[in-house]
């Protein structure tokens, strides 16, 4: 409960600072991008590590502030992640935010990629990596939506699936 409250407060603070922050700073620096990539990889591999909350806070604030990278939720399944806490709220916040962080990492690694479906699929793939890591720690963690998406990923159909459900203009 306390972690959920902290996460809500953080999101509200970051959202409130968005207009001012976007005007006050320039594009991300190479050092920041390297740190972001390191944090995202760490959160995908070890989403429950002791320092994961600090990394999520830094990534969220940074993502809101930088004008040169944005993430979107265009795929129905990405929007459905909002409802994960109705199924099991133990890890829902971590998984819900991971999709944004993994999209961010993909865009940093592939700056010329313009296909929103590809970017969205990368966000989901990163979320599924974090989900698998959580399940290794807690086998009782079950989210049917993510289980279905993992099945599609194993079949090599995740990107095609996302592309069919993409509601953004590009891709």
Task: Please report, for each region that a protein language model flagged, where it lies by residue.
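Immediate post-signal-peptide N-terminus of mature secreted/exported proteins
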Residues: 21-61
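Bacterial N-terminal signal peptides
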Residues: 7-17
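Residues at structural and domain junctions
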Residues: 8, 25-26, 45, 86, ...
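Short, solvent-exposed mixed-charge patches
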Residues: 168-171
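Positively charged n-region of N-terminal signal peptides that target proteins for export
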Residues: 1-4
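Extended hydrophobic/Leu-rich segments
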Residues: 18-20, 100
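Mature extracellular/secreted ectodomains of secretory-pathway proteins
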Residues: 52-166
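Sequence-pattern detector for short linear motifs
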Residues: 6-7, 36
